[in-house]
Regions:
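Rossmann-fold NAD(P)H-dependent dehydrogenase/reductase core
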Residues: 2-204, 280-294, 298
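Flexible, glycine- and charge-enriched loops at secondary-structure boundaries
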Residues: 78, 110, 114, 221, ...
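Short coil/turn segments at secondary-structure junctions
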Residues: 108, 163-164, 168, 213-219, ...
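C-terminal helical subdomain
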Residues: 173, 197, 216-257, 264-266, ...
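Polar helix-capping/helix-linker motif
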Residues: 81, 157, 237-238, 262-264
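A glycine/serine/threonine-rich, flexible loop-to-helix segment
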Residues: 151-154, 204-218
């Protein structure tokens, strides 16, 4: 029986890692230059881990790693660009096996967000140690509310060309992330690599004027970056979660969330569709140059 985890919504990353020695552990953290990514990197590094910090721009990663000031290797990696991913993965390979990979929530719209994660995580998973390695993938709040359209919404309009609603398709991307983690955990089970997804909370990166207004009002009631980083830090490094895999986590606890997250058949279908889409998208070098898939052109939003 799994032991109770004595942490919750108010816990911080430093608290969940108190007393955990991460010396000689090598961990990749994406989106390391701000918010939850920076807080996760800081906490893991403070406990002795060697952090490989990824940001879309090398100078952003360098600035973040310099500010954190411990054992850190900054790398630039634009997950929507094939060459950038290739270079980053090759650099990481040269540093040695990974003990954990933490994929934080990004600012990209549905297809770019999910497919970029799909490709990057699959590439990095080859570098994760068997038996003890961990992969942790972030999912935003909207994944809890998007399931009312049913599973067809995951496949019939992947890019949102026919009806574009930022919250709806952001949520669809994050549900896809949770399903991806579920299927990846199944595929890596034989290697002994644990894969879990977690709720990032509001990232503060959504870009419409209305969304920014809402965020300005609610930011006083939301968790701090250190509190939001508690769950990924727990999943990446705590001995309390050894052997736990394929689960969705929120506030340092396992959470059912959207029931579609447990649909193994849907997870397999999405994996197959994602693999085909990724082959098309990365065949052109960048996401924005990708050909159409299921008669929908690829759309991303990074502004």
């Amino acid at each position: 029986m799994a032991q109770a985890i004595p942490f919750g919504s108010c816990s911080t990353a430093d608290q969940v890692l108190a007393g955990v020695d991460l010396t000689r552990k090598r961990i990749v953290v994406t989106e390391c230059n701000s918010g939850i990514g920076y807080a996760t990197m800081q906490a893991l590094s403070a406990n002795g881990a060697h952090i490989i910090g990824l940001a879309r721009r090398l100078d952003d990663s360098q600035a973040a790693c310099s500010a954190a000031g411990r054992s850190l290797t900054p790398l630039g990696c634009n997950p929507t660009d094939r060459e950038s991913v290739d270079v980053a993965v090759q650099s990481i390979r040269g540093l040695g096996p990974l003990d954990a990979v933490v994929i934080n929530c990004s600012e990209l719209q549905y297809v770019a967000d999910h497919i970029a994660q799909f490709v990057l995580v699959n590439r990095l998973s080859e570098l994760v140690r068997g038996g003890t390695g961990r992969i942790v993938i972030g999912s935003n709040d909207n994944a809890n509310i998007i399931g009312h359209r049913g599973e067809d919404g995951m496949f019939d309009n992947l890019s949102g060309e026919r009806l574009y609603d930022s919250y709806a398709f952001d949520g669809q991307a994050e549900l896809a992330t949770a399903l991806f983690a579920k299927e990846l955990s199944r595929r890596l089970d034989a290697r002994g690599v644990a894969v879990n997804s977690f709720r990032c909370g509001a990232t503060g990166n959504r870009t419409s004027r209305a969304q920014r207004l809402i965020q300005s009002i609610t930011r006083h009631f939301t968790k701090s970056p250190a509190q939001r980083a508690a769950t990924p830090a727990l999943l990446a490094a705590s001995p309390l979660v050894v052997g736990m895999t394929g689960e969705y986590w929120s506030n340092c606890q396992m959470s059912l969330g959207n029931p579609l997250r447990s649909d193994i058949g849907l997870a397999k279908r999405l994996w197959e569709a994602s693999a085909r889409f990724a082959a098309i998208a990365f065949g052109g070098g960048t996401m924005s140059e990708a050909a159409s898939f299921r008669h929908d052109s690829l759309r991303s939003r990074t502004d």
